[in-house]
Swiss-Prot record:
UniProt gene name: ccmE
SUPFAM superfamilies, per the entry: Heme chaperone CcmE
Record keywords: Cell inner membrane, Cell membrane, Cytochrome c-type biogenesis, Heme, Iron, Membrane, Metal-binding, Signal-anchor, Transmembrane, Transmembrane helix
Functional description taken from the UniProt entry: Heme chaperone required for the biogenesis of c-type cytochromes. Transiently binds heme delivered by CcmC and transfers the heme to apo-cytochromes in a process facilitated by CcmF and CcmH.
Residue ranges the record marks as coiled coil: none
Protein residues bound to heme: 124, 128
Annotated Gene Ontology cellular component terms: plasma membrane
Name listed for the protein in its UniProt record: Cytochrome c-type biogenesis protein CcmE
Taxonomic lineage from the root: Bacteria, Pseudomonadati, Pseudomonadota, Alphaproteobacteria, Hyphomicrobiales
Annotated source species: Rhizobium leguminosarum
InterPro entries linked: CcmE (IPR004329), CcmE-like_sf (IPR036127), NA-bd_OB-fold (IPR012340)
Length: 165
């Protein structure tokens, strides 16, 4: 083998290795990415059953029904006419209650309109919510300022206060 052929073989092997690595990373990301939806989004563009997504909004007031064991059913709403029924088995976060912001993650059960969640995250303010989602909830009048957070103008815990002379 000549020197040029060896160099070409090394370059081709390196390119093949890089291509394989990129394809493996893309496959891994496609398996772990979960797109964020709100109930109004799901009404416009339904998601195929068994597609992993994140569903966010507010827990419907009076919709929390505790079943046997640690199974809980509740509705997630964003003010649209179609709240989404969610079923979750596990320990709920302390901040979870009706009217509170929530993000659930998993998929719709095949043949039903029930979202079976394996993760439930309770939110107490827009710090943990995408800005556009918080803005949509505020524009619909569903977001209550100061809910779960210190009122504006109060000094946050841990911040230094500078005295003015």
């Amino acid at each position: 083998m000549t020197r040029n052929r060896k160099r070409l073989a090394v370059i081709a092997g390196g390119m093949g290795f890089i291509l394989t690595a990129v394809l493996l990373v893309m496959f891994a990301f496609s398996q772990s990415v979960a797109y964020f939806y709100m109930p109004a989004d799901l009404a416009k563009t339904p998601v195929a059953p068994e597609t992993r997504i994140r569903l966010g909004g507010l827990v419907g007031e009076g919709s929390v029904v505790r079943g046997t064991g640690s199974t809980v059913e509740f509705a997630v709403t964003d003010g649209s006419t179609n709240p989404v029924k969610v079923k979750y088995t596990g320990i709920l976060p302390d901040l979870f209650r009706g009217g509170q912001g929530v993000v659930t993650e998993d998929m719709f059960a095949a043949g039903t309109n029930v979202f079976v969640a394996d993760t439930v995250l309770a939110k107490h303010d827009e710090t943990y919510m995408p800005k556009d989602v918080a803005d949509r909830l505020k524009s619909q009048g569903l977001w209550k300022e100061g809910q779960g957070q210190e009122a504006q103008g109060k000094q946050a815990q841990g911040q230094e206060v500078k005295a003015t002379p």
